[in-house]
Amino acid sequence: WMEQGVTIFRVDNPHTKPILFWEWVIAEIHKTNPDVIFLAEAFTRPKIMSSLAKVGFTQSYTYFTWRVSKPEIMEYMNELVNGLSRNYFRPNFWPNTPDILPFHLQNQTENIFILRYALAATLSSSCGIYGPAYEFYENTPIAGREEYFNSEKYEVRFYDWKKTNRMTDI
């Protein structure tokens, strides 16, 4: 993949593999490709997320998705900015993911989608959205769950890429 110009790898659930394996793989790749970025898609205990960062994951998913109230966001930011991991853990803020439609986005208007993106973009130096689901404000969940009703994981979806709205204009 790197020979084809790919320089960013999102690793799904790296915390389910041995930490020493990732330390070895990342070090080997960085010997010849030091600019390659590894994004840990790891929603796990903070200690394990820190361990992944220490062995070379350049960025990591975070719990931003579930920090909703002002006190929750302030406490989490304080943890990231002032905690011990601030020297090696690089948070990547995602308002949603391919798997997760958080409760606070469910059945909501575009305003909350834009607000959450603005928070992600200004509170972290690295943010992402899972679009087009996010870009087009898909907000219908499976009842009682944090999952999309019409998830792209289970069906082929087609989108009108000429369609614009406040999010696509950002």
Tell where the protein language model's regions lie, with residue ranges.
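Active-site and adjacent substrate-binding regions of carbohydrate-active enzymes
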Residues: W1-I170
